[in-house]
Amino acid sequence: MNWLDRLSRTAKILGVVSIVVFALIAVVVLPAAAWLVGDESFTATSDDGFCSDCHTMEPFVASSADSVHGGVNSAGIAAKCTTCHLPHDSSWNYLTEKLRTGVHDIWVQTFSDTSQIDWKAKTEHREDFVYDSGCLTCHVELEAATAGKRQHDNYFAGIIDSKCVTCHAGIGHSNVNQYLLEHKYRP
């Protein structure tokens, strides 16, 4: 075998090895890296600290921390902002709503005078900002519970179209109007 044949054979082997390496990178490394970046991004943008980075959310994070769902309960369990304020019925809905809400909040924070937002009026539309699927993620045994049985039975049977926060209005943010006043927002 002359040197040209050996060189040609080596080039073919290197070509095959290159294809295998690129295939492994494309099939294993890139998806794993994308998953890790995505997972870390979701985790980093899901806690109360991230939400309170925007000054306008401070009264809501504080009033949440002062509530049963913020950890003021016998078990010390605390819900995150995303537990209640994002849908948990599917990963797709969670992802798209997280993206939509995030873009909206950044836009409002950057290009609006947030001191002019009537936060009290927004609390009257809490059904638009809280998802029953979030409530039911934690309260998995609610359908079998005996407290409020008639109302909950009607809810699960679809007889009423109320949402959880229709009846449980201040459950996630205790004394929210007080916190809004302390942060100099219009109640």
Language-model features, listed with the residues they occupy:
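Short sequence/structural segments immediately N-terminal
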Residues: 2-187
